UniProtKB/Swiss-Prot annotation:
Residues 399-415 have a biased composition (Basic and acidic residues). It comes from Escherichia coli O157:H7. It is found in: Cell inner membrane. This is Multidrug resistance protein MdtA. InterPro entries: CusB_D23, Multidrug-R_MdtA, RND_pump_MFP. Belongs to the membrane fusion protein (MFP) (TC 8.A.1) family. It is a peripheral membrane protein. GO terms for cellular component: efflux pump complex; plasma membrane.
Length: 415
């Protein structure tokens, strides 16, 4: 009894499910039949509409630029540090008390300008003593020469011996030697007095004072009084790979000074322009680089000692080069390529050979010609032969606007 009861319930459930399925089937069929006349009419009005609808849609928006022919400079770049043309630590040559400083920290000075004074009292005394001794010995010499003249007259009549005459002659010579020594002592004392006035040995900018007025200083002090850095002119020391040495040497042989530009740390602003001064005489075996020195007039004080800069040295200019924006150059499995637009705004891939390149533009040595249009933005979804819409680049866009534009380009390409 229990088995037949369960069988009946199973049959009932199956029948209910079948009835529901049949209802939904007939309902869907009626809906499709009612919609068919409209669809047929639309198909009659546009026989190829379905096929075109599968292929049509918004064209992918791209930005393009025209390849131009121009002269392109070739630069060698390196990282460098500004160094003073000369750095001098001003020290005292004599010992004594510092009486005065005659400079302002940071000011520009000329060679010979008075910087400091040491108490000259002791040097004046020493000079006076030397001058007094010189005067005394000169008087002695005068008297000795008079005696010699008398001895010479008396010797003619044999009133004095030859020995006495020779002794007087020796005394005169000895006194003459003493005079020379006295003159040297006077010169030395005068020099010591002169050194009590400390002057600038070179043109340049003085730094911070190293000692205050009133202190006792000596010629052995290593810190000195002040440091002068010569910044007019000023030098730039940077490095280049050893592979660039031949290029630099060849450019030097052309006979023209090589222009070197100093750019700021971010490489966005040119600070100054100078010329190549020299190459080092050996390569650093550890880094495989060579040191290069350039000199700048720096009259505007744009460069400062120990400042970090980016160096760019012009070594050549390539004439009649085909140039495109760097953004147009792409890299694929087959090598470098660009997307070229024809007169119908259809794109095709062209393999190219790039040359000189920077962040803004690149020289194309082979693959395209001047006048060809290349895609610079919206490249992501391009396919061979696809037709695109060329839009103008906005003069100023925010990062959010650029992101929106790229997203729109992707959506258009997908369509």
């Amino acid at each position: 009894m229990k088995g037949s009861y369960k069988s009946r319930w199973v049959i009932v459930i199956v029948v209910v499910i079948a009835a529901i399925a049949a209802f939904w089937f007939w309902q869907g069929r009626n809906d499709s039949q009612s919609a068919a006349p409209g669809a047929t009419k639309q198909a009659q009005q546009s026989p190829a509409g379905g096929r075109r609808g599968m292929r049509s849609g918004p064209l992918a928006p791209v930005q393009a630029a025209t390849a131009v022919e121009q002269a392109v400079p070739r630069y060698l770049t390196g990282l460098g540090t500004i160094t003073a043309a000369n750095t001098v630590t001003v020290r005292s040559r004599v010992d004594g008390q510092l009486m005065a400083l005659h400079f302002q920290e940071g000011q520009q000075v000329k060679a010979g300008d008075l910087l400091a004074e040491i108490d000259p009292s002791q040097f004046k005394v020493a000079l006076a003593q030397a001058q007094g001794q010189l005067a005394k010995d000169k008087a002695t010499l005068t008297n000795a020469r008079r005696d010699l003249a008398r001895y010479q007259q008396l010797a003619k009549t044999n009133l004095v011996s030859r020995q006495e005459l020779d002794a007087q002659q020796a005394l005169v010579s000895e006194t003459e030697g003493t005079i020379k020594a006295d003159e040297a002592s006077v010169a030395s004392a005068q020099l010591q007095l002169d050194w009590s006035r400390i002057t600038a040995p070179v043109d340049g900018r003085v730094g911070l004072k190293q000692v205050d007025v009133g202190n006792q200083i000596s010629s052995g002090d290593t810190t000195g009084i002040v440091v002068i850095t010569q910044t007019h002119p000023i030098d730039l020391l940077f490095t280049l790979p050893e592979s660039d040495i031949a290029t630099v040497v060849q450019a030097q042989k052309a006979g023209k000074p090589l222009v070197v530009e100093a750019w700021d740390r971010t490489n966005s602003k040119k600070l100054s322009e100078g010329t190549l001064l020299s190459l080092d005489n050996q390569i650093d075996a550890t880094t495989g680089t060579i040191k290069v020195k350039a000199r700048f007039n720096n009259q505007d004080d744009a460069l400062f000692p120990n400042q970090f800069v980016n160096a760019r040295m012009l070594v050549d200019t390539e004439q009649n080069a085909v140039v495109i924006p760097t953004a147009a150059l792409q890299m694929g499995n087959e090598g470098h390529f660009v997307w070229v637009l024809n007169s119908e705004n259809k794109v095709s891939k062209h393999l190219v050979t790039p040359g000189i390149q920077d962040s803004q533009k690149v020289v194309i040595r082979a693959g395209i010609s001047a006048g060809d249009r290349v895609v610079t933005d919206g490249i992501d979804r391009l396919t061979e032969g696809a037709k695109v819409e060329v839009v103008e680049a906005q003069s100023a866009t925010t990062p959010e606007e650029k992101a929106t534009s790229r997203e729109y380009a992707k959506k258009g390409a997908r369509s």
